[in-house]
Regions:
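N-terminal non-catalytic cap/leader segment that marks the start of a structured domain
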Residues: 1-114
Length: 117
């Protein structure tokens, strides 16, 4: 199962790749949650989905729901922007002088161990 963070206009949603097409998983989650009121699965990013204690359970339930009610065609999206898999990273790690030519450009010898900052 491959997930994407996607956007159409200003609306973000989770996309689910299905045979070279993309299902609007966020929309499927909203429909599922509306019908089965015990679940509040209103997620617009992969990070939000992963905040669940058991995201695999959620994905399985919704995938079964989509199949059972033959909803794929109504959930496919055609034209959208693919966003970063992590929309709000908690930290960013960079690697300094990570190749010989770059180290020499900056006037340094290549490091023996990676320089992270």
């Amino acid at each position: 199962m491959k997930l994407l963070n996607c956007q159409i206009d200003n609306e973000r949603f989770i996309g689910l790749l299905d045979n070279n097409r993309t299902i609007n998983l966020s929309k499927a989650l909203k429909v599922y949650s509306t019908i089965y009121r015990g679940e509040d699965w209103f997620f617009n990013s992969i990070e939000d989905l992963l905040s669940l204690d058991n995201p695999e359970f959620c994905l399985k339930k919704v995938a079964d729901f989509i199949e059972r009610y033959n909803l794929k065609e109504s959930l496919y999206v055609e034209s959208f922007k693919t966003l970063s898999p992590i929309i709000r990273p908690s930290k960013i790690i960079a690697l300094g002088r990570n190749y010989t030519e770059h180290a020499r450009e900056t006037g340094y010898n290549p490091p023996e161990e990676p320089i992270f900052f």
